[in-house]
């Protein structure tokens, strides 16, 4: 049963405030200096169109403005959030859209700002031919209320009896209201069996999930009677807000549970029971952004399936086929995930391996060979470097088999085991087309790796059934090996075919894939830091006089 028609809308990971400064701008005014203003545009994921998001104030007569007006953006780690900053010289008598008023622009992703040292970046302004346009400085700051966690406990009294042979089995469903009037489910309590006066266990929920930072936004709570067949009976509902809930820190709050249908039919209807908020508290916790800002680096490693079941790379039917017109599923998966993670890795050097191939010249089978053919240094420069090495390997190795995951998982785990101070977190992307041949060893490797600062993403390509991969995912049943359970859930598996855009839009396909496979990484990183009691380091001090953009590796 669909509870309340809740829409499936993402809750922003957090809200980020961007502060903008510029240095050494072009001077377009004859008798004074420029009067600059910055316009921020964001790019639509679906249409790729740029839309104006907001503007800073105009600062008169300066080439080095520090703008007071900030941009507040919803931040999703798992999405490539492209930004465009246009700088204009504003003459009150002219329109800023005229080319003569344009001072330059910079393109970058929100993740690049957050992933910069201390969540600060400096970029050159470009766009005016033959001119040095100066630089733009961007600083990201997480809004403080985004780190709040609310903990509450509720009970009910004299709920309507819904079961013929016994009392009700009640549970609560919480919904956050959206700006368009719809509601999004954000929490469900446990079911308390056979009672009209249930007391639910205390639970915690991020405040942003409850109200998205708007303390007066409506929170709707439905009361249901649980049924085994899923057709849960609606008992009633009530509404509140975060601000109202927070008053329970000093007093009990009692809500009437109302059933609109009963209220219309029965004149003497009063309510379907009451729900009492017994306790409510708010605590702050460290966030993903805190760790990134404090210098934690995401180390990205790639492992690609070179087994024969992928088909001859020279044939169009192969999953590795290098078409001049479009990327293969392997290349799309690599690009989709890598282009987001690379923003959080300062050196942009990524180890990349293949498995399941025969290597020249002697035909040795390898389950962990460097794509760049350099055993001493498997690092590739940027995601484009990984793709280049992948394409080169397809021309030189022979696809063979079988499909072994354990060697490359253990390889990354050995590197992760050397880091225990929270300064680095490892993300391994495995792209494969089929059935795993070393399930026992892979489970053992995952269980061992679950105590280390690492996560594993597995993307299945092609038409195969991936039941074994679902088993490794561990969302429903924690992965175990020899009676030992994984300390944390560190594996995320998705079949790529579920994300392919039917119209053939590869950009949209990659965005959908990245959104799903990367969504769990921030929480997995936080779970590791919490279990090890590792606090984020303070961000490095800002450079008081930045003048030029840092060189790219």
From Swiss-Prot:
One of its GO terms (cellular component) is plasma membrane. GO terms for biological process: cell differentiation; cellular response to calcium ion; positive regulation of dendrite extension. Ca(2+) 2 binds at residues 163, 225, 227, 233. It comes from the Eukaryota. Residues 531-553 are annotated as: Disordered. InterPro entries: C2_dom (IPR000008), C2_domain_sf (IPR035892), C2B_Copine (IPR037768), Copine (IPR045052), Copine_C (IPR010734), VWF_A (IPR002035), vWFA_dom_sf (IPR036465). One of its GO terms (molecular function) is metal ion binding. Residues 299-500 form the VWFA domain. Residues 1-125, 132-255 form the C2 domain. Keywords: Calcium, Differentiation, Metal-binding, Repeat. It holds the Pfam family C2. Its cofactor is Ca(2+). Probable calcium-dependent phospholipid-binding protein that may play a role in calcium-mediated intracellular processes. Plays a role in dendrite formation by melanocytes. Belongs to the copine family. PANTHER family: COPINE, COPINE-9. This is Copine-9. It comes from Rattus norvegicus (Rat). The gene is Cpne9.
């Amino acid at each position: 049963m669909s509870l309340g028609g809740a829409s499936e809308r993402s809750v922003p990971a957090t809200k980020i405030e961007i502060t903008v400064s510029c240095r050494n701008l072009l001077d377009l005014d004859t008798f004074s200096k420029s009067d600059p203003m910055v316009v921020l545009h964001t790019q639509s994921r679906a249409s790729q169109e740029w839309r104006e998001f907001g503007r800073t104030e105009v600062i008169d007569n300066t080439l080095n403005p520090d703008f007071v007006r900030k941009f507040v953006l919803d931040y999703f780690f798992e999405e490539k959030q492209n930004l465009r900053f246009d700088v204009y010289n504003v003459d009150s008598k002219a329109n800023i859209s005229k080319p003569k008023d344009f001072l330059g622009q910079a393109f970058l992703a929100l993740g690049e700002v957050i992933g910069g040292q201390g969540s600060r970046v400096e970029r050159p302004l470009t766009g005016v031919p033959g001119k040095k346009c100066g630089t733009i400085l961007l600083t990201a700051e997480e809004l403080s209320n985004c780190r709040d966690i609310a903990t509450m406990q509720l009970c009910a009294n004299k709920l309507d009896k819904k079961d013929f042979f016994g009392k009700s089995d009640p549970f609560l469903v919480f919904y956050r209201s959206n700006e368009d009037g719809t509601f999004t489910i954000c929490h469900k309590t446990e079911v308390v069996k056979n009672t009209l006066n249930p007391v639910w266990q205390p639970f915690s929920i991020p405040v942003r999930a409850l109200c998205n930072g708007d303390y007066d936004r409506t929170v709707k709570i439905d009361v249901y009677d649980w049924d085994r067949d899923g057709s849960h009976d609606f008992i009633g509902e009530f509404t509140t807000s975060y601000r109202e809930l927070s008053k329970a820190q000093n007093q009990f709050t009692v809500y009437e549970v109302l059933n609109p249908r009963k209220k219309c039919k029965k004149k003497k209807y009063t309510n379907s029971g009451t729900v009492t908020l017994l306790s409510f508290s708010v605590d702050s916790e460290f966030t993903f952004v805190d760790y990134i800002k404090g210098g934690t680096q995401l180390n990205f490693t790639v492992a690609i399936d070179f087994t024969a079941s992928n088909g001859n790379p020279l044939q169009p039917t192969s999953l590795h086929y290098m078409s001049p017109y479009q990327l293969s599923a392997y290349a799309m998966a690599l690009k989709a995930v890598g282009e987001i993670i690379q923003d959080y890795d300062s050196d942009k050097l990524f180890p990349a391996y293949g498995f399941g191939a025969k290597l020249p010249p002697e035909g040795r089978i390898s389950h962990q060979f460097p794509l760049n053919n350099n055993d001493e240094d498997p690092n590739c420069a940027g995601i484009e470097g990984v793709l280049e090495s992948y394409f080169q390997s397809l021309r030189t190795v022979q696809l063979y088999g079988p499909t072994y995951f354990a060697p490359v998982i253990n390889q990354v785990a050995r590197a992760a085991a050397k880091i225990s101070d929270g300064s680095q977190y490892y993300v391994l992307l495995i792209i494969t087309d089929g059935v795993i041949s070393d399930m026992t060893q892979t489970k053992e490797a995952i269980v061992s790796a679950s105590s280390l600062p690492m996560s594993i993403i597995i993307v299945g390509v092609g038409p195969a059934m991936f039941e074994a991969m679902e088993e490794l995912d561990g969302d429903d049943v924690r992965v175990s090996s020899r009676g030992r359970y994984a300390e944390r859930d560190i594996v995320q598996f998705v079949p790529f075919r579920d994300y392919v855009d039917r119209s053939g839009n590869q950009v949209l396909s990659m965005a959908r894939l990245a959104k799903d496979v990367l969504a769990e990484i921030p929480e997995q990183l936080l779970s590791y830091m919490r279990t090890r009691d590792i606090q984020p380091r303070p961000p490095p001090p800002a450079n008081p006089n930045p003048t030029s953009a840092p060189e790219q590796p």
